[in-house]
Curated annotation (Swiss-Prot):
Its EC number is 2.8.1.13. The record marks H130, Q342 as: Interaction with tRNA. Its main location: cytoplasm. This is tRNA-specific 2-thiouridylase MnmA. Catalyzes the 2-thiolation of uridine at the wobble position (U34) of tRNA, leading to the formation of s(2)U34. The gene is mnmA. ATP binds at G14, M15, S16, G17, G18, V19, D20, S21, M40, G129.
């Protein structure tokens, strides 16, 4: 297919009211594209004491779009967000895991519901302020790390498909954050000095425990060591994540205590003393709901690197594809506090191969289900 010239190419930009998406729209406009800005409203904050900044954020989008001279709309994706992201978030916590809503939001909202809406506006592409790059190599789309190692967001984009990537532009992928700020300031954008948002959008500044308890009933239970010694009571397994140190309330002298495991059936929270407690370490993991961005030609084991949390340095691993579509991953070095529910994301150099959801850890390499 012959590539269209920029002025004949419509790009719909997902605008959050932040500096990254503002500069994304600016760069595309400067390159001559036909740009439309869309503000996604994903969460109903009317009953949440006005903690969410949606109204303020939309005003910033309006200001920036007026500065750039581009059309803008607000689109409501609250139902899709509730059904696809928030329900998943609660189900995972109920199952004792610690989910990553950003991965699901990118897969189901930003690059599905939003992309589909953009196509109805005649979009050729959608663009966002993510720090990542997409490269077309012989008709196959590769997801490549952003230039700024501190901001690279391929970890959160690991669930995207070829079809989604074929319609995506990431104009900030080759820039560092400080360059993006400088571009915004030079252009006098209304959002140039706005702070980056952090945390989970639907929780805002509220206390996480309080927020979760308003949706899921808490079941307090015993806090025990692996030997069965009771060290206190927990407020509900869903409030704790592996490796957590804060909020355990275990007194006494010596090294601090950490969460090292959960028993859902017996409602027991396992704790261990010391940062390097053996219960915190594992030699492998099993991941489910695996997405390969580039189709794998074989089910043979292969070596690559992986991240088990955002901003973690790459770790060497061997991946063993399973017949059910899951993978077992063995680590070159034991890993600390691997958390079920989080994403494991695979890399070959700077190319993101895909990822999956951590189902459980393998304490010993011999725990592998396949020979």
């Amino acid at each position: 297919m012959e590539a269209k010239r920029p002025e004949q190419t419509r790009v719909v930009v997902g605008m959050s009211g932040g500096v990254d998406s503002s500069v994304t729209a600016l760069l595309l406009k400067e390159q001559g594209y036909d740009v439309i800005g869309i503000f996604m409203k994903n969460w109903d904050d009317t009953d949440e004491n006005g903690v969410c900044t949606a109204t303020e954020d939309y005003q910033d989008v309006v200001q920036v779009c007026n500065q750039l001279g581009i059309a803008y709309y607000a689109v409501n994706f609250e139902k899709e967000y509730w059904d696809k992201v928030f329900t998943y978030f609660l189900e995972e916590y109920k199952a004792g895991r610690t989910p990553n809503p950003d991965v699901m939001c990118n897969k189901e909202i930003k690059f599905k519901a939003f992309l589909n809406h953009a196509l109805t506006l005649g979009a050729d592409y959608v663009a966002t302020g993510h720090y990542a790059q997409v490269k077309n190599v012989d008709g196959q789309y590769q997801l490549i790390r952003g230039k700024d190692p501190n901001k690279d967001q391929t970890y959160f984009l690991n669930a995207l498909s070829q079809q989604q990537l074929s319609r995506v532009m990431f104009p900030l992928g080759h820039l560092e954050k400080k360059e993006v700020r400088a571009i915004a300031e030079r252009a006098g954008l209304a959002t140039a000095k706005k702070k980056d948002s952090t945390g989970i959008c639907f929780i805002g500044k509220r206390d996480f425990k309080e927020f979760l308890s308003s949706y899921l009933p808490a079941q307090p239970g015993e806090m025990q060591t692996l030997d069965g010694e009771v060290k206190g009571t927990h407020d509900g397994l869903m409030y704790y994540t592996l490796g957590q140190r804060q909020g355990l309330g275990i007194g006494g002298s010596g090294e601090p205590w950490f969460v090292i495991g959960k028993n859902l059936e017996k409602n027991i929270l396992y704790v261990g003393q010391g940062f390097h407690h053996p219960g915190l370490y594992s030699e492998g993991l099993r991941a489910i709901k695996v997405n390969w961005i580039l189709r794998r030609e074989s089910d043979e084991p292969f070596e690559c690197t992986a991240k088990f949390r955002y901003r973690q340095p790459d770790q060497k691993v061997t991946v063993y594809p399973q017949s059910d579509g899951a993978v077992e991953v063995l680590f070159a070095e034991p890993q600390r506090a691997i958390t079920p529910g989080q994403a494991v994301v695979f890399y070959d150099g700077d190319v993101c191969l895909g990822g999956g959801t951590i189902d459980h850890v393998l304490k010993k390499k011999e725990d592998r289900e396949s020979a």
